[in-house]
Amino acid sequence: MAAASPSTSDAAERLARLVQRLRRLVRGELILAGGHARLQPQDETDVATALELARELAVPVRFGGVSGGLHAVLAGHADSSRGGLPGLQIDASSHLTRAARFEGTRGMIEVQPGVRLADLNRLLQPHGWWLPIETHPESGATLGGLVGLDAVAAAPAWGTLADRLLGIDAILDDGTRQLFGPFGERSSVSLNSGRAGQLVSSLFGIAAGVQADIARHWPPGQRVPDGYLLDAFHPRPQRPYTPDGSVNLAHLLAGSAGTLAWSARLHLRLLRRPAVSRWALFLQPSAAAALTHAPAVLALQPSAALLLDAADLRRLLGSRHPDDQALCRLAGIGPDMSGRPDGTQQGEAGPAAWLVRFSGEADADVQAAHRRLTALLDPRRQESTTGLALQTGGGLQSHGRAAAGDVQPVWQVLLGERVSPTSPPSACIIPLLPQDPATLAGLISALDERLASQGVQPSWRGQVAAGELQLVVPEGAGPKARQALAATLPPRWTPALREAFVEVRRQFDPTGILLGGLMTARH
């Protein structure tokens, strides 16, 4: 067996000292496994103590047990050289699971980071509210993890979790506690330490230095998984995070994937649950052909607009659940994936499909939206053009609930997978950073052509409304696909913005101990 490197040996010794001290100082459980330690804190004091000692001993820290398997691109260029060193994982999912201060009249609630999304929405359902994030039914995603990702809703009007944040009670890398919330003359938020005051002053300075870059180059209405939400300091009319366009410092923590601070308590603004939702499926000859309709589809303001690939369609066709069977019948799709609109032929890239939902308070309005969508995507379709009313728990409202046992409808699984992907990036599944939906058709056509010239047959899937697609290629074609992406996609950030992201990270975590959540990193 090879001897451990000096750096690894030193890190293991520092971790052992940390664990020894934590056992005397915290109430939560400490678990040692695989050369790492995991703390399941009983309260926020445990977290503050652990962070303060980890910084003192230079032990890397990850925030785990909060993402429900959801992957993220880590922001701020965390130090990958520390990634393999023995470290501490802080896991909120066991004990920090309380929801409090629910205001049913105004739709506001305070939660700890370990609260599961499914549990929260189950609690809110009788009151007519929900947090409009939809994940895989079995993901177990928690609020801390979803805020760390700035998880996106299926409908553009519902925004991302940053749009739902009123404030975050945060714990910084040295154990300092600070409420990140509205900032300004009308705000009641006070900076309760010298560290917090210096940090906030530095952040405003960083944002001021890139104000022109934000105005010219910031992608409106999209997540920023490869940076930090510096546009929170310079709200724009087309995408304000707050109703009055003021600065809320909590938005900077959204999407930071655990690289800036621990989110101890989340103050959330909820959304009224829509009274009616209807779904429809439309077969298209290819992803590129489907995406030519993206601007027109999104102009109809759907509450979900998903692009499915041939593998997704096979899953729907193979399902025994009545919801899935009804969707395929409505689209006129047979086992051979026949049923393409007149005048189209199956492209070499294989068929694709739109899976679209409209939601609202009046069923007549929702049905009218589906009729307009049908006229756009499949004018041949004469009957059942008003969509299917599918319940979240499965079963068809419009056709009566058929016995399906405990089988999960595939459409519901696809909704979670496409809106909040649970499969980490791999050699064959490559997530694109968010793009302007209006440009997707041209981008996908260019990439398809480039990949086809190299003998690679791609497929595409994802959430079109958010501009977030996954490129799926055959095994072994991943390197070619990544090269094609690098050659085709334009630079996302200016040098000044990239440097600003690094400086934000340094101001929050000058010693570089916060390595983010237990998610796949991209550096």
Identify the residue ranges that each predicted region occupies.
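Intrinsic disorder at enzyme termini
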Residues: 2-4, 8-11, 15, 489, ...
